[in-house]
Regions:
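Core beta-strand elements of the Rossmann-like FAD/NAD(P) dinucleotide-binding domain
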Residues: 3-5, 139-148
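Structural motif
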Residues: 6-8, 29-31, 116-117, 135, ...
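Beta1/beta-strand and adjacent pyrophosphate-binding region of the FAD-binding site
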Residues: 2-15
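Conserved N-terminal/central alpha/beta ligand/cofactor-binding core
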Residues: 21-125, 129, 152-169
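Glycine-rich, N-terminal phosphate-binding loop of Rossmann-like dinucleotide-binding domains
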Residues: 12, 140, 153-154
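Conserved phosphate-binding elements of NTP-dependent enzyme cores
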Residues: 9, 20-23, 133
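Conserved beta-strand-loop-beta-strand element in the redox core of flavoprotein oxidoreductases
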Residues: 127-142
Length: 169
């Protein structure tokens, strides 16, 4: 059904969206797999972008050409500068965004990226050859081959970390 991809990105949260877009924009034939195409870039716990720590990451992604900051700006409902009572080094912008339109905006951007395909399914296994990820097996039984696999599935591993074939819990 699928031809071989250069890159498969598993998970369409913020990291997966940025990774898939970056991969496709440099010319790699990329597949982004997510459990639900209607919850791309979902802000599960707190619909905010920014703050002291997350804000630094968003600014770094923005400097590297990512979309998180742009999509945030387009969907901001309220903006606030945090820590104004402290010195300027601690000031940090934070935007509260519309949780629904944020994901819709991300999906629209991704659907228009050349070399990028979106697929709704659950990855249940990795295809490993000589210690390298060379594809995935999905819940509906598809075996999709690629040159590399990027796992950005966040909390869906229940805190399990994979580094190569080594696992930590």
């Amino acid at each position: 059904m699928f031809q071989k991809f250069d890159v498969i990105v598993v998970g369409a949260g913020h990291a997966g969206c940025e990774a898939a877009r970056a991969s496709a924009l440099i010319g790699a034939k990329t597949l982004l797999i997510t459990q639900n195409l209607n919850s791309i870039a979902q802000l599960s716990c707190n619909p905010a972008m920014g703050g002291v720590a997350k804000g630094q990451i968003v600014r770094e992604i923005d400097a590297l050409g990512g979309l998180s900051g742009i999509v945030t700006d387009q969907n901001t409902m309220q903006f606030r500068m945090l820590n104004r009572s402290k010195g300027p080094a601690m000031w940090s912008p934070r935007a509260q965004v519309d949780n629904i339109t944020f994901g819709i905006s991300w999906r629209k951007y991704l659907e228009n990226v050349p070399n990028l395909q979106l697929w709704q399914d659950e990855v249940v296994d990795l295809i490993i050859n000589s210690g390298a990820g060379e594809g995935v097996v999905t819940k509906i039984g598809l075996k999709i081959e690629s040159k590399t696999v990027i796992l950005t599935n966040g909390t869906f591993l229940n805190g399990k970390i994979h580094i190569g074939e080594t696992n930590f819990e």
